[in-house]
A protein has these predicted regions:
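Phosphate/nucleotide-binding beta-alpha loop and adjacent structural elements of enzyme active sites
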Residues: 1-299
């Protein structure tokens, strides 16, 4: 498991366990109470900010965003967040059962590495459609989005429609792998980290290789984003240099270390940088993960 990162990175990755604690401690005066309520899913929470301001936190996402000092530019009604940042069109996202990553996508803008303006991008692991919608409102000409979990796919479909982006985003129920075929997924599973291994529930979802996805489209994508909770290894490591060189930029959220992915991309003519791995025990997938980002630019 640790062979895909250095031993030093392995040791340092465990400090990430403290990140939520430190973030909440810096934001909330009564952070123990806030964290206790979050862990028990007891909302609303009567929070006291470090500046003395009292704030009623109605749900998890409001608590989460506030912990990053994000107090404005959004409104949450039930499970729908309306984002009204000055530099982008007003956007509404239904996050369902706390799915997607609204903070990273729309506020941290983790995908700003990808020059999406007037480009075509493949979004593997579209989740609730948050990343695909972000690419579209940042100027992408077309987004080809794949999501294998039916509940996430349904939310993504609704979010795309509610933001009037049906003509810019082509959404498919499916995943990416090292061979064409299918998997059986639990139709009730949702959220980041949900396993897509064989399940007792018999819902058949197609898998396609990256090369197949490229051949099935009548246009040439130039950008690739992968956040598929492990499929990045089968997808990238099995793809030929010819296939990968279709893309000028590739961004990957890796989940089990990065070294083999970095070596593969560099051998195919990409300049590659990575963020340090962070440790997480993903309860939904039942796995230990060392995750971070890979940024690859074709030379």
């Amino acid at each position: 498991m640790t062979a895909n990162i250095t031993f030093k990175e392995y040791l340092k990755s465990f400090f990430y366990i403290l990140e939520p604690f430190n973030r909440y401690r810096k934001t909330y005066e009564n952070f123990f109470h806030v964290m206790s309520c979050v862990s028990k899913q007891k909302f609303p929470i009567n929070a006291i900010l470090k500046n003395g301001e009292k704030k009623v936190l109605k749900n998890y996402y409001e608590t989460y965003l506030t912990s990053f000092q994000i107090m404005n530019d959004y409104r949450i009604d039930g499970t729908v967040i309306s984002i009204s940042k000055s530099d982008m069109p007003k956007t509404k996202i239904d996050f369902g059962n706390n799915n997607g990553d609204i903070y990273a996508v729309f506020f941290e803008e983790i995908y700003k590495f990808l020059p999406v303006q007037d480009q075509i991008i493949i979004d593997i692991g579209a989740n609730i459609g948050d990343s695909s919608i972000y690419f579209s409102i940042r100027g992408a000409k077309k987004v080809i989005a794949l999501e294998p979990l039916p509940k996430n796919h349904s939310l993504a479909e609704s979010n795309i429609k509610n933001n009037h982006l049906e003509n810019k985003i082509d959404l498919f129920l499916g995943g990416c792998s090292n061979s064409n075929g299918h998997i059986f997924v639990d139709p009730e599973k949702e959220g980041a980290g949900s396993s897509t291994n064989h399940s007792n529930q018999k819902l058949k979802v197609p898998l396609k290789t990256l090369d197949t996805i490229l051949k099935e489209n009548n246009f040439e994508p130039t950008l690739l984003k992968l956040d598929c909770e492990g499929c990045e290894y089968d997808t990238i490591l099995s793809s030929s240099e010819e296939t990968l060189k279709n893309f000028s930029h590739i961004q990957i959220e890796y989940h089990y270390g990065y070294k083999n992915l970095k070596q593969k991309l560099e051998s195919c003519g990409f300049d590659v940088s990575v963020t340090k791995p962070n440790f997480i025990r993903n309860k939904q997938a039942g796995k230990t993960m060392f995750f971070g980002y890979i940024f690859a630019k074709r030379l």
